[in-house]
Structure formats: structure tokens, C-alpha cells
């Protein structure tokens, strides 16, 4: 607790104590309790609002993280023994297989340590779904500073901080220091976690292995622009120039901005990692030892085992016993290598690197068990790279991560979509996969194509393991739903009603505008709901994206499949409501992939109109200057310039606004500040044909938003929390279900779609009594048009039936909470967690525990991200 908290709480205690003493008779003191409680809550609120980066959820103590402390003690005990005894179990596991929607990332496990190699967008979501614990990570290795490798790193760091991880070290290119400084522009100070960058020249050693970092420099053609490893090209030097410095970039030094940026964001460096496990002493064979008469099971055996495992012969009762007679051989420690060769321009540098060559020509001890290639197919096809792979010993296995994979990563998302699809196939379309059209390279070495959760075990037995690879069986998912009591009956009713509605609306169907929900959850990506992103397809050729949280591009891939490039090319405008990470950290990947899509389809490059808080330019400027080019992708329009009555002084901004309206056939695009964090905005836009859409972003109920959304055809409003949690909603500056519906009624909106649900409502939110035939709830990958407004409320009975078990568990939690805190006091969070721990006898109890853990991290993220 910081100094401000202590002073305020101490003052509150003295004030309340003094009033209690002066209250006189006990009856009066009891009557005064309401005053005490009010005063205490007032000062506590002031204290928690003083520093938005360090405040904790009310009723929750800051996590002390027993697990990391236990690990520290274990390490101390190992060091006291003075025994560098390698771990018994080590394996490497694929997280992201390198597909277009899930960039290459690897998780390395030992009983002593956990490591992550690369952290693209969606990595955290996959780890959460597949139960790979981020809380145990203490080292993250990055092969290259590209958004494909670091897109999920800011979110991962925030999660590590929120879960109480004390320290995390990043290894890789030196620009990582600049990256960490850049993300602080929106994450705020990261004081609760110690972050450091290990220079790429340093060797790293811990209880599991020694990691040798191998810097590899390529000679890039032309300028050092944005590198596209998947398509094997550098963005053309004739790309439009960066926006003028007086609008979006401040150059505080006298040197040439172009030269300085080029030097600072050097893209010619990749870092390979040579990882050698520590030797592991052989195992003592008890049965054989007994045959030799050794005193197994007595105190005398300890020193004998130690000597034998150290490779020394012993003499016992006149008999010489050799180590190999009673111990398995010592494991010298296998080697694995991770190398990224992102384009053909790196092939020469990789293939001639002397540090890597040693492992092609060295002795048995240096023979790598595995080489991991994060390498596009265009590189694998080159003769030089093929020959380089063939120079490794024939016993070396090769693991390849690139777009030439056909694995499904997000199983839970596919499962729920398949089940929803049975209710309404058009509103809940089946998910798709992007498949590259590039032929697969013919390789003459033992190689395996990556799949999500594929393992290569290094110890105790060296082997491939496929038992953890998830299965995506749509038929099984649908069968599971069909076995839910009364579900099929409700689906039949729903379809009959929808058919009747469709017949009545025959000839009135209107395909556009079409709204596609890409992310409907809050705070952090989870296995079922991704974070904020809503695509509005205004016409067959133009789209607007409302918020762009981490993983939005991956969601687009899974929604559109092979047509994702067409969808990307149509996006002309992106609106960012505010600078919390769950609303904007998917922007860069979207911009880079959109440029790739335009090139692939042979279309002229065009910039996106970015309507966002002005503070986003601090982040984009720093990333552009020190990491990769990005400013040449945008025409920036500050949110405040679209507020009612705003004076726009810059002619450039005025021209951008007019171009945005013309491009999207809009009559008006308005914004207003809302009641959330600093510089949070909502928006509304009116089409030339007369329809109007209003989007709340994150906010408490807000009169200004009601004004700009008057008579909206569609209102998309956040409903983060259920009714009964109004105090928590105020604390986190969000809306409850009924509050969101009330805003729509005051707005006189034709239809209200609720959105941005707390991740505790993973599958479905709790319904309020205010639900009516003008209200619907959003799901990831849900696709609606205005003609669906009559249908959407008719889906609710089938949805309630499908998720009846989840709704029942949420209602039980609510009842327990209300029993303990009838007025919905702010300490409900802690009480709910204790309750879920106590109810540890059912399947529902386990879900409660998971919900409570998610709630804890989400609570911190909602308040500090």
C-alpha cells in the first residue's frame, strides 16, 4: 500500500474512532454505523483512485504469489547442495504453429523453469485455453523485433504483473528496451514487476540449461522498412511518406528523422538460440544394488549412491562396484536450436554463421537433438537453406513453423461456434481456416510440421508426443449440444418462428450494413471471448472497425478464412475508443496484414483513417521510431476533433474528416467523451441512406453519449457487469446490463446489442428483467444485419437452454453473494472467492474457482490497463 493509502486510511480510522467515542450510549453508536461505513468507503475510494496503477480490487489483498516464493526456496536449496543436477523432465511444446492467425511461439518446460520463445498476438489466449501457466514464466526469448513476434508481449507482461510474477527477463534484439519504454505509454508504470533486457551477446544459465544467443545480421536490399516474412518481401521504398512531423511526430533532435529512425529500428538482426540442457546424473538402480549386497534402505547407502552417481567406483565388503553396474548412464545434456530466417535476404547470413556451423560438424556431444525453423516456405525452397539443413547430423530432428500448417488452435472458440450454428447458421456462421496456396517445399531431412501443443520431449525419453494435440471435431461438438435437455426442441421452435419472420420480411432483406463481432469480452483475451473488436461492413466495398484489441486479425482469419485479404482491403477506417490495451493492441497487426493483402491482391496501397485519442500517437511514434515503420499506414484524426462544437484548426485534419465521410458514404461521424478513463470516447455515425449506428466503447451511463446517439438504428453498448454489481461498475467505470439497456431506451434506439462482457460470463451473461424485444447479446463471430433485429430476441430461449448449466452456476454465485452482502457491498469479490474454494465438491465448484481467478486478474486489468 502506498503512502497516500496509509495516510487516508489512518485518518479515516481516527475520525471514525473519535466519532464512536463521542457517540455516547451503545444504541447511538449502533445507529452511527451507517455514517462510519460511508466515511470509510469515501476515503477508501479516494485512496484507490489516487494511483490508478497500483490500486487493488476492494476486498482483495495483493497477490503474494506463493508459487514463485516456493520456487525461490527450491533454488536456494539446490544451490546449497552445490549440485548442478539437470532436470528430469524437459520438453518443448508448440503454442502457435506459425499459421497466419497464430504466429510461431514455443513453450519450454522443465520442473525448474518455464520459457517462452516469441509472443505474438493470441499467445496468451492459447496458453490460457490449453492451461500452460503464464505465472511460471521468468524468461521470454524473442528471435526478432517484429510485431509478429512481440504483438502479444504487452498483454503478457500486464498479465504477469497482475498475477504477481516478481521478475521477467527478455532476451533478443537490443530494441527490446525501446519496445518496453514504448508500451509504457499506454500500460502505465510497470513497477510491480521487474523487467529487464538481456544483451544478445550474453550467455544465460539457470538450473535447467545454458542458452547461447547468436546474433545474425542480414544485408537488406534498399531501406530497412517493414519486413514481411510470410510473403518474403520488404515493403517498397516507394511507400507513402510518413505523416508530417507537425501533425503526428515530434523530432526533438537535429539529425535527419529518416536516418535516425532507420538506425534505431534496424530490422537486419535476428537472434538464434542454442540451448544446452545441464547434464543429468544417472539413476540409481535399486534392484541391481541389492544384488551386489549394497545396504539399500539404510543410512549408509547415501554416500555410496553419491559417489556412484558421480562416476566413481566404490569398494563395499571387499567387492569393487563400478558405476555402470548400478546406475544408468549420465545424460550429457541434449542441445536444441531455435532459428528464425524470415526472408531470403537472411539465408546467406544464417547458412554461413560459424556458431551454428559448429553444431553441424561437431562431436556427439554437440549434435543437436532438434532444430526449430521459424521459416517461410519461400526460404525452405532455396537450395542454400536446404543444403544447410542437410549438414546437420542425420539423427537431428527438424521442426518447421510457418503458414503451411493445417492445425486448429482455438478449440473452445470453434466448439461454441459450432453449437451456436445449430441455432441460426447465418447469424452464427461456421469458422474457417486460412490455407496458404504456396506449395510445400520438398525436404530431405527428418522434419515435422508444427501443430498446436505438439511436444518434443528431451527428457526422460527423447521422442515426439502427440497426445496433447487438441482435436476439433465439429460433429462431436454438435452432438454434445444436442444432448442438452430440451435444446433441440428449443432450436426447432426458434427455427419455426424465424421462418415465419423471414416470410413476413421477404423482399425487404438488407444485407448492408452488416455487423460482425470479432471480440466481445473485456480486459484480456480468453478462450471463448476475445477482447474488443467490431467490424461494420457499410457496403460491399467499405468497412469500419470499432476498436481493435489484441488478436482481432486472428479473429478475422477465423471468420473469413481464405477471403480474409478481401475483408482487410475493405477496411478504410478504424475507431479506437480509448487507450486501454484490450481496445487497441491489435491495431499494428491489422495494419501490417492489410498492406500485405493489398499487395497480394494487386491493389494500390491506401492509408487507413485512424480516429483515436491523441495519446495513441505517443505509442505509434515510439514504435515507428525504434521498432518498425507504422506511421505511413495511417491518416490520423483525433477523437476530440469530431466532438460537437470542436474547433479543428489544422487544414490537414479537416481534409481527413471530409475524406473519411466521403469514403464511407457517411453524412456525419460524431464522438463524445464518456465516463471511463481519461480521454475515453464513444462514437456515432450516420449513413447517407439514413441509418445510424452508435458505439459506446467503455463507459458508465453517459448523457453525452445519449445525445450523439439519438434515434440510432443500432446501439452497441458495453454491459460489462450483471445487475446487482452497480458498486463494482462504478469502481471500474463500466455499465451493468440494465444501465446499458436504459441508455438505449433514452436514446430511442431501434435495437440494442449488449457487448464487452466481463470474462466471468465466458459463454453467456446473466439476463436482466429489463430484457425485451429490442435487446440482443453479442458473441464472438456473430454476424447481424438490420433485418435480423426481430429475430435476435427469439434466439434467447435456445441460448438459455444451451447454457443452462452455466447460467445456473452464475445464479448460485449471485445468490451466495447476496446472502453475504444484501446491498451488494464492494467486498463481494473476496467473499465470492472464499465461497468457491469451499464448494470444492462438484464440477461447478471448479468452474467457480476458474471464474474467481479470472475475475482477480480481470479486475486489476479493468482498473489499470
Language model features with spans:
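Metal-dependent phosphodiesterase/nuclease catalytic metal-binding core
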Residues: 32, 47-87, 107-109, 205-516, ...
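Residue-level recognition of the N-termini of beta-strands and the immediately preceding loop/turn
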Residues: 137-138, 166-169, 195, 369, ...
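Active-site neighborhood of phospho(di)ester-bond hydrolases with catalytic His/Asp-centered motifs
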Residues: 117-120, 137-149, 172-173, 338-343, ...
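N-terminal mitochondrial targeting presequence
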Residues: 1-47
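A short acidic (Asp/Glu
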Residues: 153, 179-184, 348-351, 381-385, ...
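Residues that form ligand- and interface-recognition hot spots within folded domains
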Residues: 96, 110-112, 121, 131, ...
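A glycine-rich helix N-cap at a beta->alpha junction
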Residues: 189-200, 633-634
Amino acid at each position: 500500500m502506498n503512502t497516500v493509502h496509509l495516510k487516508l486510511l489512518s485518518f479515516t480510522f481516527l475520525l471514525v474512532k473519535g466519532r464512536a467515542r463521542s457517540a455516547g450510549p451503545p444504541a447511538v453508536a449502533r445507529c452511527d454505523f451507517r455514517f462510519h461505513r460511508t466515511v470509510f468507503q469515501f476515503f477508501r475510494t479516494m485512496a484507490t483512485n489516487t494511483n490508478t496503477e497500483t490500486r487493488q480490487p476492494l476486498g482483495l489483498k495483493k497477490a503474494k504469489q506463493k508459487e514463485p516464493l516456493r520456487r525461490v526456496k527450491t533454488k536456494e536449496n539446490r544451490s546449497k547442495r552445490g549440485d548442478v543436477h539437470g532436470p528430469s523432465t524437459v520438453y518443448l511444446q508448440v503454442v502457435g504453429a506459425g499459421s497466419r492467425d497464430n504466429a510461431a511461439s514455443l513453450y519450454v518446460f522443465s520442473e525448474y523453469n518455464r520459457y517462452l520463445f516469441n509472443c505474438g498476438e493470441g499467445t496468451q489466449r492459447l496458453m490460457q485455453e490449453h492451461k500452460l501457466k503464464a505465472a511460471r514464466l521468468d524468461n521470454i526469448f524473442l528471435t526478432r523485433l517484429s510485431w509478429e513476434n512481440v504483438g502479444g508481449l504487452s498483454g503478457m507482461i500486464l498479465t504477469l504483473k497482475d498475477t504477481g510474477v516478481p521478475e521477467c527477463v527478455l532476451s533478443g534484439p537490443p530494441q527490446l528496451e525501446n519496445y518496453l519504454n514504448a508500451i509504457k505509454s499506454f500500460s502505465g508504470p510497470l513497477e510491480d514487476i521487474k523487467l529487464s533486457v538481456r544483451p544478445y551477446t550474453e550467455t544465460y544459465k539457470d538450473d535447467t540449461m545454458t542458452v547461447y544467443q547468436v546474433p545474425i545480421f542480414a544485408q537488406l536490399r534498399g531501406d530497412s522498412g517493414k519486413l514481411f516474412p510470410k510473403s518474403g518481401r520488404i515493403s517498397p521504398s516507394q511507400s507513402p511518406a510518413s505523416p508530417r512531423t507537425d501533425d503526428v511526430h515530434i523530432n526533438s533532435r537535429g539529425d535527419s528523422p529518416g536516418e535516425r529512425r532507420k538506425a534505431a529500428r534496424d530490422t537486419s538482426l535476428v537472434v538464434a538460440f542454442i540451448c544446452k540442457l545441464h547434464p543429468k546424473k544417472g539413476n540409481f538402480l535399486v534392484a541391481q544394488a541389492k544384488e551386489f549386497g549394497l545396504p539399500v534402505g539404510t543410512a549408509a547407502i547415501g554416500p555410496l549412491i553419491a559417489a556412484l552417481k558421480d562416476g566413481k567406483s566404490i569398494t563395499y565388503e571387499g567387492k569393487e562396484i563400478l558405476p555402470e553396474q548400478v546406475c544408468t548412464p549420465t545424460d550429457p545434456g541434449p542441445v536444441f536450436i531455435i532459428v528464425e530466417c524470415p526472408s531470403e535476404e537472411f539465408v546467406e547470413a544464417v547458412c554461413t554463421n560459424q556458431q551454428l556451423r559448429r553444431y553441424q560438424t561437431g562431436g556427439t556431444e554437440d549434435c543437436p537433438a532438434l532444430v526449430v525453423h521459424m521459416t517461410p516456405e519461400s526460404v525452405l525452397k532455396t537450395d542454400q537453406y536446404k543444403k544447410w539443413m542437410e549438414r546437420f547430423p542425420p539423427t537431428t530432428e527438424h521442426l518447421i513453423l510457418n503458414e503451411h500448417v493445417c492445425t486448429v488452435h482455438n478449440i473452445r472458440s470453434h466448439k461454441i461456434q459450432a453449437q451456436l450454428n445449430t441455432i441460426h447458421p447465418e447469424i452464427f456462421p461456421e469458422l474457417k481456416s486460412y490455407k496458404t496456396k504456396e506449395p510445400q517445399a520438398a525436404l530431405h531431412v527428418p522434419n515435422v510440421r508444427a501443430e498446436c501443443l505438439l511436444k518434443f520431449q528431451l527428457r526422460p525419453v527423447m521422442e515426439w508426443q502427440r497426445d496433447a494435440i487438441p482435436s476439433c471435431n465439429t460433429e462431436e461438438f454438435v452432438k454434445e449440444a444436442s444432448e442438452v435437455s430440451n435444446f433441440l426442441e428449443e432450436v426447432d421452435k426458434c427455427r419455426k418462428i424465424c421462418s415465419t419472420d423471414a416470410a413476413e420480411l421477404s423482399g425487404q432483406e438488407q444485407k448492408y450494413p452488416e455487423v460482425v463481432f470479432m471480440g466481445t469480452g473485456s480486459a484480456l483475451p480468453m478462450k471463448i471471448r476475445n477482447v474488443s473488436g467490431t467490424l461494420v461492413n457499410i457496403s460491399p466495398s467499405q468497412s469500419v472497425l470499432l476498436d481493435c484489441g489484441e488478436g482481432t486479425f486472428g479473429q478475422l482469419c477465423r471468420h473469413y478464412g481464405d477471403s480474409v485479404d478481401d475483408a482487410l482491403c475493405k477496411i478504410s477506417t478504424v475507431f479506437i475508443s480509448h487507450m486501454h490495451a484490450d481496445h487497441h493492441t491489435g491495431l499494428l497487426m491489422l495494419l501490417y496484414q492489410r498492406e500485405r493483402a493489398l499487395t497480394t491482391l494487386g491493389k494500390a496501397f491506401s492509408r487507413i483513417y485512424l480516429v483515436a485519442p491523441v495519446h495513441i500517437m505517443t505509442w505509434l511514434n515510439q514504435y515507428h521510431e525504434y521498432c518498425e515503420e507504422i506511421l505511413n499506414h495511417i491518416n490520423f484524426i483525433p477523437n476530440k476533433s469530431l466532438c460537437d462544437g470542436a474547433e479543428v484548426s489544422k487544414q490537414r485534419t479537416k481534409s481527413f474528416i471530409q475524406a473519411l465521410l466521403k469514403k464511407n458514404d457517411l453524412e456525419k461521424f460524431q464522438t463524445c467523451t464518456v465516463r471511463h478513463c481519461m480521454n475515453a470516447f464513444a462514437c456515432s455515425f450516420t449513413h447517407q441512406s439514413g441509418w445510424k449506428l452508435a458505439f459506446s466503447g467503455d463507459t458508465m451511463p453517459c448523457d453525452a453519449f445519449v445525445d450523439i446517439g439519438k434515434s440510432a438504428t443500432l446501439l452497441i453498448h458495453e454491459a460489462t457487469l450483471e445487475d446487482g454489481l452497480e458498486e463494482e461498475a462504478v469502481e471500474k467505470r463500466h455499465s451493468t446490463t440494465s444501465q446499458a439497456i436504459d441508455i438505449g431506451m433514452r436514446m430511442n434506439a431501434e435495437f440494442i446489442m449488449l457487448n464487452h462482457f466481463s470474462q466471468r460470463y465466458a459463454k453467456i451473461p446473466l439476463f436482466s428483467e429489463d430484457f425485451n424485444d429490442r435487446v440482443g447479446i453479442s458473441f464472438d463471430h456473430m454476424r447481424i444485419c438490420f433485418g435480423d433485429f426481430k429475430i435476435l430476441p427469439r434466439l434467447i430461449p435456445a441460448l438459455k437452454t444451451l447454457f443452462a448449466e452455466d447460467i445456473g452456476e452464475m445464479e448460485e454465485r449471485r445468490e451466495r453473494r447476496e446472502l453475504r452482502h444484501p446491498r451488494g457491498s464492494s467486498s463481494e469479490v473476496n467473499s465470492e472467492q472464499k465461497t468457491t474454494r469451499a464448494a470444492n465438491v462438484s464440477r461447478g465448484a471448479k468452474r467457480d474457482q476458474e471464474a474467481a481467478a479470472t475475475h482477480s486478474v480481470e479486475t486489476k486489468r479493468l482498473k489499470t490497463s
